[in-house]
Amino acid sequence: MLPLYLEKLTMPELKQRAEALHQLLVECRICPNECKAKRTEGETGECHSKVEVYISSVGPHFGEEPPLVGTNGSGTIFFTNCNLDCQFCQNYDISHLGMGEKASKSDLARSMLQLQQIGCHNINLVTPTHFSPQIVDALVLAIEKGLELPIVYNCGGYESVETLRLLEDIVDIYMPDIKYSIDENALKYSGVQNYWETVKLAVKEMHQQVGDLKLSKRGIAQRGLLVRHLVLPNDIAGSKAVVDFVADEISTDTYLNIMDQYRPAYHANIYPELNRRITPSEYKDVIDYAHNKGLIRGFDPN
């Protein structure tokens, strides 16, 4: 299966998408924060970023979901900064403290091609939202030099439908992390307004574009939606409503990775309710609930 950008778009169309995305940076509305920062003129957005791209690391990753990892790894590019401000972020040095190095569009294109050369199964863009125009610029260069891997958009779910529509037929695999169904908690712990309604609209748009996750005969992800959800202590995430949304409004064939690896990090120690690992029973409760809703892809229901 060809990547969507080779199957659906011409090079002039891809360049037009990049130009349209760049217009969203002028008074920034690339994400639902809509902070209006003039990033193209050197102002810093809510994401702590100007127009220059910063990357913390590039390489094959073997800790992602099995359909992404395959045998040779997922070709991850970790972008610095984030449009969320999660107080328990486990990658806070990258997302909040700005760890990373400046990368031109040529650098980024070169990284994509290197990941392809070493055999990675995909280009996995980690926290790409705030740099999506520049990423498409780099994709143009990489495609001209032979890139033919599927693109994974690995994000925190706080996405603008306007931006997502400009990414249609560019992204093959959307991988949003649905963090909360409780807006009050999204504001308190991640600093964003109206998260629940926003993430639902975004995930519906993603699914409309790419459908349920499709695998090759070897079990490698080729196209579709893969949803993540991290169970938080004391049900701070509102996990059952997230499961209901996926099962009832997306598809019971959704690949849903219900994650149990929460550990207190960054500023979690400030919040007693966040300052512990989840219990086995908290996790099992969500898994059992998802199984009863008919969801089985992405986790062991037993």
Which residues are covered by each model-predicted region?
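Auxiliary Fe-S-binding modules of radical SAM enzymes
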Residues: M1-E43, G211-N302
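Conserved Radical SAM active-site core
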Residues: C47-I173, I182-D183
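Hydrophobic faces of well-ordered beta-strands that scaffold small-molecule active sites
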Residues: G75, I123, I151-Y153, Y174-P176, ...
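Conserved radical SAM core fold
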Residues: S95, S132, G157-S160, I178-W196, ...
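Aromatic/hydrophobic pocket-lining residues that form the small-molecule binding cavity
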Residues: K105-L108, I135, V199, V203, ...
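Alpha-helix-loop-beta-strand connector modules within alpha/beta enzyme cores
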Residues: L139-P150, L201-M206, P280-V286
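Non-cysteine beta-strand/loop elements that form the S-adenosyl-L-methionine
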Residues: E168-D183, D253-Y262
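Anionic-ligand binding region
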Residues: L187-R218
